[in-house]
Amino acid sequence: MHFTQVLISLSVLIACGPVGYGDITAHQQPSTATEESEQCSTCEFRQHSKLMRLHAIKSQILSKLRLKQAPNISRDVVKQLLPKAPPLQQLLDQYDVLGDDSKDGAVEEDDEHATTETIMTMATEPDPIVQVDRKPKCCFFSFSPKIQANRIVRAQLWVHLRPAEEATTVFLQISRLMPVKDGGRHRIRSLKIDVNAGVTSWQSIDVKQVLTVWLKQPETNRGIEINAYDAKGNDLAVTSTETGEDGLLPFMEVKISEGPKRIRRDSGLDCDENSSESRCCRYPLTVDFEDFGWDWIIAPKRYKANYCSGECDYMYLQKYPHTHLVNKASPRGTAGPCCTPTKMSPINMLYFNGKEQIIYGKIPSMVVDRCGCS
């Protein structure tokens, strides 16, 4: 049994209590002291349920992302590695526009692990076998085994151009690197770009065909060389960082197709922290990743996870006939029904993995949509 499953089992066992088969009438007019005692007990139990949920969420995220531990990436490293490029900004803008509450068109996933939608791979220095006097310094891209050639929707190479001294035409060249003994390089793309004086820009190049070959024949991936010459022969492509150029190195953005999904239906009892409801109910819970010290999660910085808490008394079991039958069949020694999530939905997350690659994917079963007795 996985650690995550143990945590969930513990929280379920703690949430379970004996089914109340006593005299229902006797509880209709309790004393004030009894009410206060029950409310105090309910608050303590609810707080315990919340803490258990937070603890389980941390373990679930690492498990679903197939991480043994949280990547050791500090805020300074995040600032250095984050590309200041349009595709990343578009993803971040989605969180600003949609917020944490957006549920329109939400779906539930069958898979227990995260599904990848977009991968952003940063350029690194290529293998010495393709270099002469340690040149070129750029660019090699390593790819996650999650990427399958037949699932690639789009693959774009993003290159940042330094400002030209005057309006000019820039010749952007992409060459595939090969061992020096085999010729060193082979040009695969060449573009002409008109630029204005003093203006920086990001340029994107379609590299789906190249990436497909690399994935099918990994031994051919030695990296690429990028040049962007203006009319005076100046290379404007940023392929090594200088002062003030953090986040401007080339990177590849790979869009992956998603798997099948189902439309989610919402229903169930909702409560807030001030509610006096004793029945099984869904309560709000905001998870703040900064409180966890998880700087490796780029977005969202927080999300609404929700949690379940409350009683599953005999009088409520008519809503859950299967649980009622189980308890009637074995009235002694049973823990009774538990208040647990009966419907959950995924969250989208932008994060660094252990290889310092930026991943945009979907993590299933992270938001409690409905609670019930089972």
Swiss-Prot record:
GO terms for molecular function: cytokine activity; growth factor activity. Acts specifically as a negative regulator of skeletal muscle growth. May down-regulate muscle-specific transcription factors such as myod and myog. Residues 1-22 form the signal peptide. Glycans are attached at residues 72, 274. It comes from the Eukaryota. It is found in: Secreted. Predominantly expressed in muscle. At hatching, expression is strongest in the skin epithelium, and is also found in the retina and brain. From day 28, expressed in skeletal muscle. In the adult, highest expression is seen in the gastrointestinal tract, brain, muscle, heart and testis. Also expressed in the adult pharynx, kidney, spleen, liver, gill, eyes, skin, swim bladder and ovary. Gene3D superfamilies: 2.60.120.970, Cystine-knot cytokines (2.10.90.10). Homodimer; disulfide-linked. Belongs to the TGF-beta family. This is Growth/differentiation factor 8. CDD domains: TGF_beta_GDF8. Residues 23-265 form a propeptide. GO terms for cellular component: extracellular region; extracellular space. Disruption phenotype: Defects produce a giant phenotype. InterPro entries: Cystine-knot_cytokine (IPR029034), TGF-b_C (IPR001839), TGF-b_propeptide (IPR001111), TGF-beta-rel (IPR015615), TGFb_CS (IPR017948). Induction: Repressed in adult muscle, and stimulated in adult spleen, when fish are grown in overcrowded conditions. Disulfide bonds join 271-281, 280-339, 308-371, 312-373. GO terms for biological process: cardiac muscle myoblast proliferation; immune response; muscle organ development; negative regulation of cardiac muscle myoblast proliferation; negative regulation of growth; negative regulation of growth rate; negative regulation of skeletal muscle tissue development; negative regulation of striated muscle tissue development. It comes from Danio rerio (Zebrafish).
